[in-house]
Design a protein with these regions (language model features):
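Short, structured active-site-proximal loop/turn typified by the sulfatase FGly-forming signature C/S-X-P-X-R
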Residues: 1-27, 33-38, 94-96, 116-125
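Stable alpha-helical elements in mature extracytoplasmic
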Residues: 3-4, 10, 26-27, 80-84, ...
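Short secondary-structure boundary/capping segments
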Residues: 32, 112-114, 205-212
Length: 232
């Protein structure tokens, strides 16, 4: 990931930090500043009031916050915290969210990035995964525009049927948002969270053939294409 490494060298790296192996927990920590022991989002979230734990006969499952996080009270099994993005907005920043959100379950306040202080939301909603990266499948929508999966990516209708991989569509939208932000007489903050490299392991055909030629298996080449598309 040479481009990610290049950005890191120009920015700030956190070398004494903990990232939970469940991505929901890490995102909730990023937005609220609370670690997963405190916010108690210890598994992935999706549907309101529904835990996603697998049944177990050997361990007692914890009572965790399966509705995610929020800035307001009133939703059970939810950690209430302050968003650093809201603090930025209150202090004059133009705030942009692009890509994966996954802060709160469906139909809770925290599911919408605007709840957290983002003035612009591009493709963020309750799900942390996605139905497909493929525009040929409308990123998880039927031809009449209805999502056929809870993980259908919203907000990318302009790219349906164009042949543009979801990762590239998000990158293009982020660049457009930054170009607009530069015209404003204020600082800006972009939270960029690609859906890649989450399953499904779809083939990004811009890069897939290259890895096949290098001798990788079909699945390995597809996974490598996701990584390069994210790093582009």
């Amino acid at each position: 990931t040479p481009n990610m490494e290049r950005l890191a060298k120009k920015g700030m790296m956190f070398t004494q930090a903990y990232a939970c192996n469940i991505s929901s927990a890490t995102r909730c920590s990023l937005i609220t500043g609370a670690n997963n022991t405190r916010h108690r989002v210890t598994n992935w979230t999706l549907e309101k009031n529904k835990a996603t734990d697998r049944p177990s006969n050997t361990i007692e499952l914890p009572d965790w916050n399966y509705n995610g996080v929020s800035q307001v009270t009133g939703t059970p099994n939810t950690f209430v915290g302050t968003s650093f993005v809201e603090l930025l907005r209150q202090n004059g920043y133009h705030t942009i969210h692009c890509g994966k959100a996954h802060f709160g379950s469906i139909d809770t306040p925290g599911e919408n990035p605007t709840h957290w202080g983002f003035e612009v939301n591009i493709a963020g909603h309750a799900a942390g995964g996605l139905a497909t990266y493929l525009s040929e499948q409308n990123y998880g929508h039927t031809r009449d525009g209805k999502p056929y999966s809870l993980m259908a990516i919203p907000g990318l209708e302009d790219y349906w049927g164009t042949g543009i991989f979801a990762t590239e569509a998000l990158t293009q939208e982020a660049i457009k948002a930054l170009d607009k932000a530069k015209k404003y007489n204020q600082p800006f903050y972009l939270y960029m969270a690609h859906y890649a490299i989450h399953v499904p392991v779809d083939k990004d055909m811009r890069f897939f053939p290259k890895y096949i030629k290098k001798g990788l298996s079909d699945k390995e080449a597809a996974y490598a294409s996701l990584i390069e598309g994210m790093d582009k």
